[in-house]
Structure formats: structure tokens, C-alpha cells
Design a protein with these regions (language model features):
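Extended, charged alpha-beta segments that form solvent-exposed binding/catalytic grooves
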Residues: 1-192
């Protein structure tokens, strides 16, 4: 857990504002999700990985288990599914801190800032193109040049595995590392 001093805080806040304005220009609406929620709501339909990265505490009023969010995407999905009740595409964006029980890699923060844009209710190729374009503009605005694009479609992953012609053990190790988003481990498996 680290402090962000004035000069760096100013840069981060300027970038956050710029990116939220960018997302708004594409029609995305800002949502702010709770930092802490009851576990049954926070982790519904989520992966074991998210459960492992979620800090858990006992609510002193109700005695129920609560969690401090480790990801905002599931909360945004819940807002779309249960709160907005809209027809057609729904575009939501967010920017806030999350908290992880352990860092996701070497030299990474346990309290990272997450910013994102989510498009719900539309599954055409236009949706994919829109999100890749937004991602590209986001990376360019952040002056990030060394880019690795991670596409979360298992069909793409399986096709790449076939092309790579890896043995079964390596495929299994790679799949586990990808699911856990352990980027250092992915590099290690691919370079072995």
C-alpha cells in the first residue's frame, strides 16, 4: 500500500478526468460502485480468483460477511442487469480504487486504480471494434507504448493453443496462468 504524492497525484487525476471525458464522448455513463458490500452480492457469479483477491470482514451490525471490492466490472454488470432496466446497448464506465489481498505480480500495488468502459446488451462485431478502439485511445492517452492485448474469448485462446502446438502440460499451465491473470507466469511458461 503506497501513498501518491502531489505531483504524481495530479498526473493521475488529470489522466482519470481525460479518460472519463473520452468515454463520455463515446456515450459511456459514469457509475460509482460501493467499496464494500455483502459477499453474497459482491461475489455472485464470479470466479474463484476474484474470491481469493477479495478482503473479507464481518459486518458489526448484522454479523454477515462483507467484502471490499477487488474488481469493479462485476458490480457494473450487476448495475446493468438489476438497476437500469434499459432496452438495447448500455454503456457504463468507472474509475476508482480496488483492494487485493495479494499483489497480482511483482512490483504491483495491492490498491490499484481501475478505470474501464463496459458495453452491455449488444454482442455484434461492432461492439468488439468499439471497445478495441476505446482501448487504443485509452492507451495512447496514457502514453503506454509497450502493449499486450488480452482478449478474453476462450475460442481465440484455444485457436492460438492449436497454432502453438504445445504439449498438454504446458497448455494446462498456460491456461491456469491466463485465468489468474498472472502475466509473469504466462511469460515464464511461454519462454520455457
Amino acid at each position: 500500500v503506497e501513498e501518491i504524492l502531489p505531483a504524481e497525484a495530479y498526473k493521475l487525476e488529470s489522466l482519470r478526468r481525460h479518460l472519463l471525458d473520452l468515454y463520455e464522448s463515446w456515450g459511456y455513463q459514469l457509475v460509482i460502485t460501493p467499496l464494500i458490500e455483502y459477499l453474497d452480492s459482491l461475489l455472485v457469479g464470479s470466479s474463484t480468483d476474484l474470491d481469493l483477491h477479495t478482503f473479507k470482514i464481518t459486518d458489526q451490525l448484522s454479523g454477515r460477511m462483507m467484502g471490499i471490492r477487488a474488481d469493479i466490472t462485476p458490480q457494473a454488470a450487476r448495475i446493468d442487469a438489476h438497476c437500469l432496466n434499459r432496452e438495447g446497448p448500455v454503456r457504463l464506465c468507472y474509475a476508482d480504487n480496488v483492494l487485493h489481498t495479494r499483489p497480482r505480480g511483482i512490483m504491483t500495488s495491492r490498491v490499484p486504480i481501475r478505470i474501464g468502459a463496459e458495453l452491455y446488451g449488444y454482442s455484434g462485431v461492432e461492439c468488439d471494434i468499439e471497445l478495441v478502439c476505446i482501448m487504443h485511445e485509452t492507451l495512447r492517452a496514457a502514453e503506454i507504448n509497450d502493449v499486450h492485448i488480452v482478449l478474453g474469448h476462450v475460442g481465440i485462446f484455444r485457436t492460438l493453443l492449436l497454432e502453438a502446438n504445445l504439449d498438454e502440460g504446458t497448455e494446462r499451465s498456460l491456461f491456469e496462468a491466463v485465468q489468474r491473470k498472472e502475466y509473469d507466469r504466462i511469460d515464464e511458461v511461454l519462454n520455457s
